[in-house]
Amino acid sequence: MKILAKGNGNGNGHAMFIGRWQPWHKGHRWLIDQALNEGKKVLICIRDVEADEKNPWSPIEVMLNITNELIELIEEGRIKIIIIPDIESVNIGRGIGYDVIEHVPPQEIGEISATKIREGKI
């Protein structure tokens, strides 16, 4: 874990993860588990992107796919899932009130490829 920007949060918020999640896979689960294992609640934001070769599923289909795997954590109130408009950048200023954290996965997780999954190669 690498903290890219330090905030002054009170620890009561959610760890937010933004992605296309096309498809949801164990690398994504590893990432979410990093926050859950620290006792944080998680907000999964699904980008509402146009359907194409890299994004074959609608945001609703993605939400249902993730919900099916994480239903117990959702019911416990540890995870929330929302759909957000597509974004092109995440911008911060000083005194942002929250940390910006990069999680660096181990090699076997980092090698998981949604593209290869979509192509049926793994």
Language model region names:
Residues 1-122:
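Nucleotidyltransferase catalytic core that binds NTPs
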